[in-house]
Amino acid sequence: MNGLVIDTSAWVSYLAGGGKPELVEPALEDDRALLPPVVAAELLSGKMSPRQRRALMALLDDVILLQADQEHWYRVGDLRAALAAHGLVVSTPDAHVAQCALDLGADLLTEDAIFSRMASEVPLRLVR
């Protein structure tokens, strides 16, 4: 099975008791859940109690943290430029998440509509 890059929006829904547990939990159990570094930072930026923070960090510690080398960041810039040429302005964090999925040929779990718009221009495989 393919890896599953999980975007911040999908994590937030899942952690709140919603989202797609039928996709997230098997990916966690099978070591297919993939965590872009920016998603970890975004999740840890949220307001939470010290206990919630420890629980979140314990969960994230069990997820594969993706590495982003210099070439990856060049591809992120190229992706943003290509999308902008089609009139689609994408933030660097969202382009990074998309590029992580593209680099690995992984599926992307998200609830953010920007990724659907991106998928109309690049071969991004979204699961919902």
Where are these regions (language model features)?
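Active-site neighborhoods of divalent-metal-dependent phosphate/nucleic-acid chemistry enzymes
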Residues: 64-109
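Acidic, PIN/NYN-like endoribonuclease modules and their adjacent C-terminal/linker elements
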Residues: 1-3, 98, 102-128
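Short, hinge-like loop/turn segments at secondary-structure boundaries
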Residues: 50-54, 83-84, 125-128
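A general structural signal for well-ordered alpha-helical segments in protein cores
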Residues: 21, 36, 40, 53-56, ...
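A generic structural signal for short hydrophobic patches within well-formed alpha-helices
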Residues: 11-12, 40-43, 115-116
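Short, well-structured N-terminal submotif of metal-dependent ribonuclease cores
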Residues: 1-35, 45-58
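Conserved beta-strand segments of alpha/beta enzyme cores
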Residues: 32, 64, 123-125
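Histidine- and aromatic-rich ligand-binding microenvironments
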Residues: 6-7, 35-36, 89-92, 112, ...
